[in-house]
């Protein structure tokens, strides 16, 4: 059990048979009446976001999530197959469960798979990944790092804005949290 006073961004709770993650919270103490906590919750399974208000100090069941590092091995139809490299046990997740993470997911990549009650819920990518540029306008001599940007499509199909001097075939580091270019990858 967790008190609503202890909510932090990222805290997970069980509510109505589902797992919810606290996205935003605000402790409110009005001049008249009792204090309360206004929250914005995101359903881990579906991604739905709701606003909910709890009394200050209200006790709620905390969802205990388990994380396992698994390797993305292959796709079978619409399912992504992950393998525990220690036990060789396979875990399957649907494209819906993967969500936006699929635009950076490539075979052989190690990710954290989050489970609740032995059911996989979602995939947590590393903060940055190295991917190859597959499509972009050609780089022209004289383009500088301080100049503008252009769109580039990466090997996984993700699109990010990159500096003008980059060209097809180069490997770049991308931040998976906000889809931004971090730099060239020397390999």
From Swiss-Prot:
InterPro entries associated with the record: Elong-fact-P_C, NA-bd_OB-fold, Rib_uL2_dom2, Transl_elong_fac_P/YeiP, Transl_elong_KOW-like, Transl_elong_P/YeiP_cen, Transl_elong_P/YeiP_CS, Transl_elongation_fac_P
GN (gene name): efp
Upper classification of the organism: Bacteria, Bacillati, Cyanobacteriota, Cyanophyceae, Synechococcales
Pathway per the UniProt entry: Protein biosynthesis; polypeptide chain elongation
Signal peptide as annotated in the record: none
Molecular function in Gene Ontology: translation elongation factor activity
GO aspect biological process, one term: peptide biosynthetic process
Keyword line: Cytoplasm, Elongation factor, Protein biosynthesis
Family assignment from sequence similarity: Belongs to the elongation factor P family.
Protein name as annotated: Elongation factor P
Annotated localization: Cytoplasm
GO cellular component: cytoplasm
Organism: Synechococcus sp. (strain WH7803)
SMART domains: EFP (SM01185), Elong-fact-P_C (SM00841)
């Amino acid at each position: 059990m967790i008190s609503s006073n202890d909510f932090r961004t990222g805290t997970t709770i069980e509510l109505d048979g589902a797992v919810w993650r606290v996205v935003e919270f605000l402790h409110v103490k009005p001049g008249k009446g009792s204090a309360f906590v206004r929250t914005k919750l995101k359903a881990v399974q579906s991604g739905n976001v709701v606003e909910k208000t709890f009394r200050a100090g209200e006790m709620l069941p905390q969802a205990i999530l388990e994380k396992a590092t698994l390797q993305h091995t292959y796709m079978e139809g619409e399912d992504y197959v992950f393998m525990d490299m220690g036990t060789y046990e396979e875990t399957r997740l649907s494209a819906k469960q993967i969500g936006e993470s699929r635009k950076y997911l490539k075979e052989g990549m190690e990710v954290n798979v989050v489970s609740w009650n032995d059911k996989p819920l979602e995939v947590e990518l590393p903060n940055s990944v190295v991917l190859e540029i597959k499509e972009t306008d050609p780089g022209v001599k004289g383009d500088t790092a301080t100049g503008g940007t252009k769109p580039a499509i990466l090997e996984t199909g993700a699109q990010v804005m990159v500096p003008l001097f980059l060209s097809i075939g180069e490997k770049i580091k991308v931040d998976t949290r906000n889809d931004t270019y971090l730099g060239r990858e020397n390999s």
